[in-house]
Amino acid sequence: MPRIRLDNLFGDPFALASVSISLLAWLIAFVSAIISSIRDSFPPIYWWNLVYMFLCIVGIAYVMATATTHIYSTAVVGYVSAGFAFTTFAADGLLKKQSGSNEAAGAGFILLSIVNVVWIFYFGSSPQSRSRHYIDSFAMHKEQPSYLNPSQMSNHYNNRPDTTVSTQPPQMYTSAQLNGFETSSPYGAPPGPSGASGIGNSQVNLAGTSSNGEAPNEVSPPTEYPYKAKAIYAYEANPDDANEISFTKNEILEVSDVSGRWWQAKKATGETGIAPSNYLILL
């Protein structure tokens, strides 16, 4: 489950402003609705509009605080579009009533409608669009996967935690350490340079494996890849890291986990490895 980080919300001027304005507009409509219910008559259906918009505001704040906009953007657009219809309908009905409290509630719904339009535009825009790029450029902690060129992405991801395969140096043996192996073979290898070489290689291989023939630090790859991702840039794997995989632009990959900066991916050819998430976009 994604972690809630308030830095993602307070460090993003757009997120902070839109959520704050929507909360202020909701409070205006809510307080005015209470006053209208006491003094005049407030249509009961509009209470559902207030509850629905409150849930939308909380949900959008959660999405922005967890930096999962790229995952839930489609759902957010759908919910906010329905909320826009609700708030517009409520504003039209309340402004027709000759009452100060109803008109104040209608003003709150109008302000909510304006924020809804802005949210529909933002969450409905592609991450590669210029408008989305411009808005996100003011954020302090937001990752911008589609706005960096490939060279910037490569440098941005060079500081990832090293994996077991890439950090473990090859085990080297000197001739002094291998001395005497030609006389200790249980297989009866012939003495001499050829026999010593064969037994030495056998001992080196056995030294790096466990009793059941598997490497002690080897991590088995996942068997399920529930997500699909599309490469927005071509990527060439680091030759010094056997865990990475190369892929071409627009290539479709299967992904097992979408958390973190590096995703475990599988190509159509069956090749598996890790890929930088900023080069991929979920489908």
From Swiss-Prot:
Residues 199-214 have a biased composition (Polar residues). It is a multi-pass membrane protein. One of its GO terms (cellular component) is plasma membrane. Residues 149-168, 182-223 are annotated as: Disordered. SMART domains: SH3 (SM00326). Its main location: membrane. Residues 224-283 form the SH3 domain. Forms homooligomers. This is High osmolarity signaling protein SHO1. It comes from Uncinocarpus reesii (strain UAMH 1704).
